[in-house]
Regions:
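Hydrophobic residues within alpha-helical transmembrane segments
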Residues: 20, 54, 58-61, 90-97, ...
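C-terminal transmembrane helical hairpin of 12-TM major facilitator-type secondary transporters
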Residues: 82-127
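Residues that define the loop-to-transmembrane-helix transition and helix capping
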Residues: 16, 50, 85-86, 108, ...
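Helix-to-loop junctions at the C-terminal end of transmembrane segments
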Residues: 67-82, 166-167
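Transmembrane helix-loop junction
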Residues: 39-44, 75-76, 103, 133-134, ...
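A late C-terminal transmembrane helix in Major Facilitator Superfamily
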Residues: 67, 134-171
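Flexible cytoplasmic inter-helical loops of multi-pass small-molecule transporters
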Residues: 1-7
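Extracytoplasmic gate region of multi-pass secondary transporters
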Residues: 12-71, 121-128, 132, 155-163
């Protein structure tokens, strides 16, 4: 039955060690890039709309290069003996570190953190080929859909959480235009 297949996927050690952190990485990136980046740059960093637009363009271009580049690079490196899971973990670590830099307001007008965010934002999708090698061939679509559902649930939770914190904090009137 379908329930049995999903339980087999979720109980797999590789799934429950890799999928949650990958889903969290994807969800945090989707949340920041899709909803909160513009507001953060305006309200926290105090950037103009022109400066914001340039940074959002940088994120979009870096995301495109990151998606293609990480896929090609992990394939190349895995042929040289580099473990795909370690590559994934390194990319996720970079993604989470740059998010900490945003939270701590480190170099708020810089470009480098937006480049790193874009390059590593979609790195969580590299979990799919890793996991698909651990299941029977018919399980891959269910594994991918389980991660996708988890990711989008986390997106909504993170969006709500950030919004809630910002509502408690309130706007900084000194940054108003």
């Amino acid at each position: 039955s379908n329930f049995y297949v999903y339980m087999q996927i979720i109980k797999n050690k590789n799934f429950y060690t890799l999928a949650p952190v990958s889903a969290l990485g994807l969800a945090s990136f989707f949340t920041i890039q899709g909803l909160w980046a513009n507001g953060w740059m305006a309200d926290v960093a105090g950037l103009s709309q022109e400066e914001i637009g340039l940074r959002l363009l940088i994120v979009a271009v870096a995301m495109s290069f990151g998606t293609l580049g990480n896929g090609a690079l992990v394939d190349y490196l895995s042929k040289k003996g580099v473990d795909r899971a370690k590559y994934l973990a390194t990319g996720l670590m970079m993604l989470f570190i740059v998010q900490i830099f945003f939270a701590l307001n480190i170099d708020t007008d810089g470009y480098w953190q937006w480049v790193i965010l874009g390059l590593t934002g979609n790195i969580g999708v590299l979990v799919h080929p890793i996991l698909n090698k651990t299941y029977p061939p018919g399980y891959s679509a269910r594994s991918i859909s389980t991660i996708a559902v988890s990711t989008f649930l986390l997106v909504f939770i993170i969006q709500f959480g950030i919004g809630y914190i910002l509502d408690i904090w309130g706007p900084d009137e000194s940054l108003s235009l």
